[in-house]
Amino acid sequence: MLKNKHLLDPSDFTIEEFDEIFKLAHQIMTNPKEYQNICNGKILATLFYEPSTRTRLSFESAMIRLGGQVIGFSEPNSSSVSKGESLRDTIKTVNCYADLIAMRHPLEGSAKVASMYSDIPVINAGDGGHQHPTQTLTDLLTIKEYKGNLEGNTIALCGDLKFGRTVHSLIKALSRYKNNKFILISPIELRIPNYIREQILEKNNIEYKEITSLEEGIKEADILYMTRIQRERFVDQSEYERLKDVYVLDEAKMKGAKEDMMVLHPLPRVNEIAYEVDEDSRAFYFKQAKCGMYVRMALMAKLLGEA
């Protein structure tokens, strides 16, 4: 039973619980009218201390489509946080008004702190460069729906692997499925953190390699997961300017990929995927965004005990 559980990290749920969510998400995708009122009377609080378009709107749309309502803020300056209110007090206050919290925060571990003071489920919608579990559910559902299998794939992850919370969460989740291999493509400065390499990949004897060439990595990939170089994570903006255009996926590079390769991106895109790639049948990132809404509908329905 997922009722009243927190989702702070992909490892909080078992593979069987993932499958429960994916099964319900598929049912909602195919028959949305059946689920349009199951969360009637429920309220989601969206607490976004960092900017967001897709994640926030996806959560809001998901709850509204389930018949529920949404309260919250999209920037801390519009809340009592700007007056110095602690995260603890914000969470305890929101518990008085809502049935469920989705929170994005710039500090790693903030979702864990929030869960310690919450009697209602807390969903981590991104905590700094740490984890982004609902994006991971989105990614897994997209692969399952359009690729058919979460096992036995070669996954190339490209771009900002150091600060990219979506990358960290996805590796953590896909490492739990059999026979997956990883190709980690990044500049030296943006390599995957040691804790991912040592505690997840090496500890579990998962095959991986680290390279700097997108052209090399794309040849073997069943799934290519592109990410943007994140300006907001850099202290030195000159370093960002030097690295921001290091990887650009275009049709010329796509010619070196498998015919059935899947291109994913958590979005927003800056210029790491050329617009011409959007017309390629292997581009799945907008389908991925739609899957995000359905998987969040399924997740919230489960956490609220309504499905």
UniProtKB/Swiss-Prot annotation:
Record keywords: Pyrimidine biosynthesis, Transferase
Any one GO MF annotation of this record: aspartate carbamoyltransferase activity
E.C. number: 2.1.3.2
Reactions this protein catalyses: carbamoyl phosphate + L-aspartate = N-carbamoyl-L-aspartate + phosphate + H(+)
Enzyme class: transferase
Matching PROSITE patterns: CARBAMOYLTRANSFERASE
Pathway: Pyrimidine metabolism; UMP biosynthesis via de novo pathway; (S)-dihydroorotate from bicarbonate: step 2/3
GO biological process: 'de novo' pyrimidine nucleobase biosynthetic process; 'de novo' UMP biosynthetic process; amino acid metabolic process
InterPro entries named among the record's database cross-references: Asp/Orn_carbamoyltranf_P-bd, Asp/Orn_carbamoylTrfase, Asp/Orn_carbamoylTrfase_sf, Asp_carbamoyltransf, Asp_carbamoyltransf_Asp/Orn-bd
Residues binding L-aspartate, per UniProt: K83, R165, R228
Binding site for carbamoyl phosphate: R54, T55, R104, H132, Q135, L267, P268
Family the UniProt entry places it in: Belongs to the aspartate/ornithine carbamoyltransferase superfamily. ATCase family.
Function of the molecule: Catalyzes the condensation of carbamoyl phosphate and aspartate to form carbamoyl aspartate and inorganic phosphate, the committed step in the de novo pyrimidine nucleotide biosynthesis pathway.
Subunit record text: Heterododecamer (2C3:3R2) of six catalytic PyrB chains organized as two trimers (C3), and six regulatory PyrI chains organized as three dimers (R2).
Alphabetical list of PANTHER family matching this protein: ASPARTATE CARBAMOYLTRANSFERASE, ORNITHINE CARBAMOYLTRANSFERASE, MITOCHONDRIAL
Record NCBIfam families: asp_carb_tr, PRK00856.1
Name of the featured protein: Aspartate carbamoyltransferase catalytic subunit
Protein species of origin: Clostridium perfringens (strain SM101 / Type A)
